[in-house]
UniProtKB/Swiss-Prot annotation:
Record region (Domain II): 89-130
Localization terms from the record: Cytoplasm
SMART domains from the UniProt entry: AAA, Bac_DnaA_C
Entry's Gene Ontology molecular function annotations: ATP binding; ATP hydrolysis activity; DNA replication origin binding; lipid binding
Name listed for the protein in its UniProt record: Chromosomal replication initiator protein DnaA
Native organism: Bacteroides thetaiotaomicron (strain ATCC 29148 / DSM 2079 / JCM 5827 / CCUG 10774 / NCTC 10582 / VPI-5482 / E50)
Protein family membership: Belongs to the DnaA family.
Length: 470
């Protein structure tokens, strides 16, 4: 047998596969595979993406193994060369004889969970894991009108950390619009350009867990000293510091030290600084020292581009009308769009269905209409402020104007009824009030609802708007 004749060998395999799978499955998962080389009883093939690899391993591993043995010979191995997405691990090898999960190259795992760095001694730059996700970079961040400003500012920071006026850089926007992607992209680019920089990405939740552990273990000074050695600190979901006074106080000192020593800070949040309740004023002031940039929900055109990019990276093909339909009907977040693509591919594969408009409508209808969005305090504040024609910040002031007081009390009452937050938390988020103030507000609103029909109609109107948002 001529080992270099990889094309002939793969064509033999395709003939076997054609007889064992429906045409749609063959065209989707096997036709795009390109044979590269055959040597040492190993067939190397090129596949379009990591996603492709995962589907082949999960759904077709037995078929591939049997096909290789039948068409080429017992003990034949298959090696995948993953293409398209530059962040994928190339040359993933799967020994199909031994296990459908054994790989010759083990990807470096992205550190997550509650693993904390050692605070007793700051590791050298080369030993410090930045906790960045390499799949989030500028190359695969799709730009549109809704995120153009944030993208431009982020790139400027990455090119010259702590050397621009954008320090700190505060990125905010709804869930799933790309804040975490952009924050990671900044860190990844800085590591590429400045290998000697100590870059660290950490979620606000993990920072809080680490701080609590340091208090318990009497190592708080080590915790602070470690963070003060960082050159570029990225804190994701900073709103989670709300109401946690001691964590805020510790972060305040870390922030000051880093900023005063010419280090870059990047913060993300689901809301603008002006709407961050339960946060110390001195921190809020510092959040606004540099650049505050919003990532808005993606426009229809941007959603289409995101879908095309996702489909291309995964080595898939969707009809244009399917892409248009998804983009026009799934409008909450990028994460939702990518989830729909995966759901469509899964259903297409499992049930051997063509990817067409009917399939897309079935999937989208199930996701969009069965989704019950929880009402948040932010939702309540937006609806109440709009109803009373108030600025969003007014409700958080100490104003005793009748309309402000009434709006604040109604917001507290609705938050008590529509969310799972305690009265103390509600008070922190709405005007930074205490538990007793919230109880008094709820009692006042409830009492007025019982005797005032016009007030009752007003609250019902606000509630109906809230339910529409949900």
């Amino acid at each position: 047998m001529i080992e270099s004749n990889h094309v002939v060998l793969w064509n033999r395999c395709l003939e076997v596969i054609k007889d064992n799978v429906p045409e749609t499955t063959y065209n989707t998962w096997f036709a795009p595979i390109v044979p590269l080389k055959y040597e040492d009883k190993t067939l190397i093939v090129q596949i379009p993406s990591q996603f492709f690899y995962e589907i082949l391993e999960e759904k077709f591993v037995d078929l591939l193994r049997k096909t290789l043995y039948k068409a080429i010979g017992e003990g034949t191995k298959l090696m995948y060369n993953v293409m398209v997405d530059k962040t994928s691990i190339p040359n993933q090898t799967v020994n199909l004889e031994a296990s459908n999960r054994s790989t010759a190259v083990t990807p470096k795992s992205i550190v997550g969970g509650n693993k904390a760095p050692s605070f007793l001694k700051a590791p050298a730059v080369q030993d410090l894991d930045p906790h960045l996700n390499p799949n989030y970079n500028f190359e695969n961040f799709i730009e549109g009108y809704s995120n153009k400003l944030s993208r431009s500012v982020a790139e400027a920071v990455a090119q010259n950390p702590a050397g621009t006026a954008f320090n700190p850089l505060f990125l905010y926007g709804a869930s799933g619009v790309g804040k975490t992607h952009l924050a990671n992209a900044i860190g990844t680019k800085i590591k590429e350009l400045y290998a000697d920089k100590r870059v660290l990405y950490v979620s606000a939740h993990l920072f809080q867990v680490q701080y609590t552990d340091s208090v318990r273990n009497n190592t708080t000074n080590d915790f602070i000293n470690f963070y003060q050695t960082i050159d570029v600190l990225i804190i994701d979901d900073i709103q989670e510091f709300a109401g946690v006074t001691k964590t805020q106080n510790t972060f305040f000192h870390i922030f000051n030290h880093l900023h005063q020593n010419g280090k870059q800070l990047i913060l993300t949040s689901d809301r603008a600084p002006v709407l961050l309740q339960g946060m110390e004023e001195r921190l809020l002031t510092r959040f606004k020292w540099g650049m505050v940039a919003e990532l808005e929900k993606p426009t229809v055109e941007l959603r289409k581009n995101i879908l095309r990019n996702k489909i291309h990276r995964d080595g898939l093909q969707f009809p244009p009308e399917v892409i248009d339909y998804i983009a026009e009907n799934v409008n909450e977040s990028v994460r939702d769009l990518e989830g729909i693509v995966i759901a469509i591919m899964a259903r297409s594969t499992i049930f051997n269905k063509e990817i067409d408009l009917d399939l897309a409508q079935h999937i989208v209808h199930g996701v969009v209409h069965n989704e019950t969005k929880a009402v948040t305090i932010d939702d309540i504040l937006k609806v109440v402020c709009k109803h009373f024609d108030l600025e969003a910040s007014a409700i958080h002031t100490k104003s005793r104007k009748r309309e402000v007081v009434q709006a604040r009390q109604i917001a507290m009452y609705l938050a008590k009824n529509y969310t799972d937050f305690s009265t103390s938390k509600i008070g922190k988020f709405i005007g930074n009030k205490d538990h007793a103030t919230v109880l008094h507000a709820c009692k006042t609103v409830k009492g007025q609802l019982e005797v005032d029909k016009s007030f009752q109609a007003e609250v019902q109107e606000i509630e109906s708007l809230l339910k529409k948002k949900a």
